[in-house]
């Protein structure tokens, strides 16, 4: 029988789920039994069950910053989710809750507070997301990735831990990655991903510039569910995937450059791998602007180049990729000087302290 029991939560996008997985090996070493609460049909269910972690589904309403008719009905879903979470927590009796944010986390955190179960949350981005803002009053500690984030957190709850990086991401195999893509030449490899849900804009721009890009690079393109273009299935040097999990460490090890959104979890993995990256953050029209702040921070440190969505026209993306290639050594040199490290150990220590305070 395990010494401790933890229930993790978080969902909506992979960025609210995969950091939880980064903690799992170390939690098991520390003798934690691990279970997970997510939404019934979110991306978290597939990711978590694939990793053989017991999963409980609850109802949850989306948290919106804009007017929508569903804003009138979703609070009732949240209340239902709190009731369902209370039932699960009463039965499971965890020692601590770890929340990675996303709208599914709010009912779980509130239920844990009602049951007086310690809650530790983690915020990846520079400014707290809406779910973590709502959850913060019910949390014992809120771990952050960026030092600048501490000023947004009240009552000395903030703890600077860094971003949890999955160990397997650092242990990919380049030869295996090239083999998966059937790349047999020595061209440099450009790895493109638009987040777990894909990016229509990035997909279109890459395909528009594909022939030019293929002169210099082989291309791995993670394009999102339902976004594989059948017109390019047999295009030499161009490999498309809807989404990858097990193959990701090998594909990232194989690549020389990355084009990506600027979610904090991902960019700290790119930094750990020392991969020169062109960051295309979600615009303020489609987000709260957190990715723009993340990308600006990395550009300022000299780790990445940045291209705003509004700047993408004509040949701008292609020219920016050529600049990325030209500045490869400079960017790698800057990343090698970085003091950033994985936050796994620091987060585990916060969880252990929370459990011991409870006991």
From Swiss-Prot:
One Pfam family this sequence matches: Glyco_tran_28_C
Catalytic activity: di-trans,octa-cis-undecaprenyl diphospho-N-acetyl-alpha-D-muramoyl-L-alanyl-D-glutamyl-meso-2,6-diaminopimeloyl-D-alanyl-D-alanine + UDP-N-acetyl-alpha-D-glucosamine = di-trans,octa-cis-undecaprenyl diphospho-[N-acetyl-alpha-D-glucosaminyl-(1->4)]-N-acetyl-alpha-D-muramoyl-L-alanyl-D-glutamyl-meso-2,6-diaminopimeloyl-D-alanyl-D-alanine + UDP + H(+)
Pathway: Cell wall biogenesis; peptidoglycan biosynthesis
Gene Ontology MF annotations: UDP-N-acetyl-D-glucosamine:N-acetylmuramoyl-L-alanyl-D-glutamyl-meso-2,6-diaminopimelyl-D-alanyl-D-alanine-diphosphoundecaprenol 4-beta-N-acetylglucosaminlytransferase activity; undecaprenyldiphospho-muramoylpentapeptide beta-N-acetylglucosaminyltransferase activity
GO cellular component, one term: plasma membrane
Transmembrane feature ranges: none
Enzyme Commission number(s) of this protein: 2.4.1.227
GO biological process, any: carbohydrate metabolic process
CDD domains for this protein: GT28_MurG (cd03785)
Keywords assigned by UniProt, alphabetized: Cell cycle, Cell division, Cell membrane, Cell shape, Cell wall biogenesis/degradation, Glycosyltransferase, Membrane, Peptidoglycan synthesis, Transferase
Superkingdom of source: Bacteria
Presence of the UniProt keyword RNA-binding in the record: no
Enzyme superclass (EC): transferase
Cellular localization per UniProt: Cell membrane
Binding site for UDP-N-acetyl-alpha-D-glucosamine: 13-15, 166, 196, 291
Similarity field: Belongs to the glycosyltransferase 28 family. MurG subfamily.
NCBIfam families referenced in this protein's UniProt entry, alphabetically: murG (TIGR01133), PRK12446.1 (NF009102)
Function: Cell wall formation. Catalyzes the transfer of a GlcNAc subunit on undecaprenyl-pyrophosphoryl-MurNAc-pentapeptide (lipid intermediate I) to form undecaprenyl-pyrophosphoryl-MurNAc-(pentapeptide)GlcNAc (lipid intermediate II).
Protein name as catalogued: UDP-N-acetylglucosamine--N-acetylmuramyl-(pentapeptide) pyrophosphoryl-undecaprenol N-acetylglucosamine transferase
Lineage, opening ranks: Bacteria, Bacillati, Bacillota, Clostridia, Eubacteriales
Gene assigned in the entry: murG
């Amino acid at each position: 029988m395990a010494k401790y029991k933890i229930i993790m939560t978080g969902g909506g996008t992979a960025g609210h789920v995969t950091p939880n997985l980064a903690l799992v090996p170390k939690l098991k070493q520390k003798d934690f039994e691990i279970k997970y609460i997510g939404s019934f049909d979110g991306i978290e269910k597939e990711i978590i069950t694939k990793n053989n972690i017991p999963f409980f589904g609850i109802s949850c309403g989306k948290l919106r910053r804009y007017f929508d008719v569903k804003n009138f009905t979703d609070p009732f879903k949240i209340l239902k989710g709190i009731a369902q979470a209370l039932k699960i927590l009463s039965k499971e009796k965890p020692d601590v809750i770890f929340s990675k944010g996303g709208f599914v986390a709010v009912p779980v955190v509130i239920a844990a507070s009602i049951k007086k179960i310690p809650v530790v949350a983690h915020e990846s981005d520079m400014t707290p997301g809406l779910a973590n803002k709502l959850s913060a009053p019910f949390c014992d500690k809120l771990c952050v990735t960026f030092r600048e984030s501490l000023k947004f957190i009240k009552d000395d709850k903030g703890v600077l831990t860094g971003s949890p990086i999955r160990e397997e991401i650092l242990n990919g195999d380049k030869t295996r990655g090239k083999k998966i893509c059937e790349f047999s030449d020595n061209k440099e490899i450009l790895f493109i991903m638009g987040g777990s849900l894909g990016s229509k804009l990035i997909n279109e721009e890459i395909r528009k510039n594909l022939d030019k890009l293929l002169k210099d690079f082989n291309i791995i393109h993670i394009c999102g569910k339902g976004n594989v273009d059948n017109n390019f299935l047999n295009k030499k040097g161009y490999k498309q995937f809807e989404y990858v999990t097990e193959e990701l460490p090998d594909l990232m090890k194989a690549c020389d450059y990355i084009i990506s959104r600027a979610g904090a979890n991902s960019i700290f993995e790119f930094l750990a791998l020392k991969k020169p990256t062109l960051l295309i953050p979600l615009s303020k029209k489609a987000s709260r602007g957190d990715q723009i702040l993340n990308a600006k921070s990395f550009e300022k440190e000299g780790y990445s180049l940045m291209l705003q969505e509004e700047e993408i026209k004509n040949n701008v993306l292609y020219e920016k990729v050529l600049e990325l290639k030209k500045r490869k050594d400079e960017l790698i040199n800057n990343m090698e000087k970085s003091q950033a490290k994985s936050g796994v150990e620091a987060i585990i220590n916060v969880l252990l302290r929370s459990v011991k305070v409870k006991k």
